[in-house]
């Protein structure tokens, strides 16, 4: 019998074969029909600051859990790209990274203001990023060394000695917080810039500077150690700082209140994560779901509590709502805001 004849199927046999095969296809789980998109791939998170600070620590903590929650279990790596208050990193994600979900940006939360104020070098539109969301609501506080005689913010206002504060650059939201305190609440201070918030804290340890404004979650370990004492905060609050005076409540100048409110809006996107524009919706759904699951992961929550880092998932939609609040300000308000907020 020829090979051709040997394997020839009659109509009845053919239908039986198709029925069996069709049932096999019908009842095969979808995930076995095609490999997950991220299988065998590497995701790079580009952090817009140097190693050691709050943004970097958050990204490295997420790195250890994202692989677990993304189908296909991709490798996740961190790349630090400090410079120009995260503008360099933001430009890279917007213009150079492929929209394939393999490059994620973790810039500072102040980048919307760099765009709002038309800062030189800005080559992005924050409203057109594919937003993943934010991993925290970050409250800002001003803290000074505990060995200094200042017990309250009123003590600082009455001080004859200039306060030397450390920061990572004028585009940092917490630095802008301190600048507005200087302009509208009479804080006598001078700012010195360092490569990262870790370097700022080292400078405080060495008594090179008197304190810093920073996110409360980043300051808390040093508050608990007794190194620094918090004296005033922004509008957003976290457990442990509820009793601190709020900058907006102390200001009598109407414009000052508006500017402080604008700045504090960015705290709702305290740890932003974005992908390049035009990243496919199905890929963005994977990333958003993974980030939301990571933040709820009991192991991550335990680690974040151990490291005294607050985590909270803020959805892409909520981030866009914050951006809408920032960008709908009248031109005259934005123009005057630019006198105080620099990059």
Where would I find each of the regions flagged by the language model?
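An extracytoplasmic/periplasmic, membrane-proximal ligand-sensing/linker region
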Residues: 40, 225, 281-343
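Short, well-ordered beta-strand elements
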Residues: 41-50, 76-77, 104, 162-167
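Short, polar/charged alpha-helical segment
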Residues: 52-72, 175-183, 222
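Ligand-binding pocket segment of bilobal, Venus flytrap-like solute-binding proteins
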Residues: 82, 166-249
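Hinge/capping helix and adjacent helix->loop/strand transition within the periplasmic-binding protein
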Residues: 92-103, 111-199, 252-257, 268-303
């Amino acid at each position: 019998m020829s090979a051709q004849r040997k394997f020839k199927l009659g109509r009845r046999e053919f239908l039986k074969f198709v029925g069996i095969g069709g049932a096999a296809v019908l009842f095969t789980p979808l995930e076995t029909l095609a490999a997950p998109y991220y299988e065998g791939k590497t995701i790079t998170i580009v952090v817009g600051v140097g190693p050691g600070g709050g943004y970097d620590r958050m990204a490295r903590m997420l790195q250890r859990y994202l692989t677990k929650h993304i189908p296909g279990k991709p490798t996740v790596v961190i790349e630090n790209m400090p410079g120009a208050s995260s503008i360099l990193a933001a430009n890279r994600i917007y213009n150079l990274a492929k929209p394939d979900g393999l490059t994620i940006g973790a810039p500072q939360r102040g980048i919307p203001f760099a765009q709002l104020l038309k800062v030189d070098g800005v080559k992005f539109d924050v409203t057109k990023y594919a937003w993943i969301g934010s991993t925290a609501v970050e409250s800002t506080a001003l803290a000074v060394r505990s060995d200094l005689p200042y017990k309250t913010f009123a003590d600082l206002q009455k001080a004859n000695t200039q306060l030397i504060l450390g920061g990572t650059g004028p585009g940092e939201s917490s630095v802008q917080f301190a600048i507005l305190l200087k302009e509208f609440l009479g804080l006598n201070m001078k700012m010195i810039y360092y490569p990262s918030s870790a370097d700022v804290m080292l400078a405080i340890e060495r008594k090179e500077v008197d304190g810093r404004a920073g996110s409360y979650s980043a300051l808390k370990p040093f508050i608990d150690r007794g190194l620094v004492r918090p004296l005033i905060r922004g509008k957003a609050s976290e457990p442990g700082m509820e009793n601190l005076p709020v900058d907006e409540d102390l200001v009598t100048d109407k414009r000052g209140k508006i500017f402080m409110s604008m700045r504090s809006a960015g705290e709702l996107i305290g740890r932003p994560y974005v992908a390049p524009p035009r990243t496919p919706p199905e890929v963005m759904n994977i990333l958003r779901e993974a980030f939301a699951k990571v933040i709820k992961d009991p192991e991550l929550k335990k680690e974040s509590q151990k490291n005294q880092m607050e985590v909270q998932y803020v959805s892409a939609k909520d981030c866009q709502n914050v951006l809408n609040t920032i960008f709908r300000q009248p031109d005259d308000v934005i123009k005057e805001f630019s006198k105080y907020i620099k990059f």
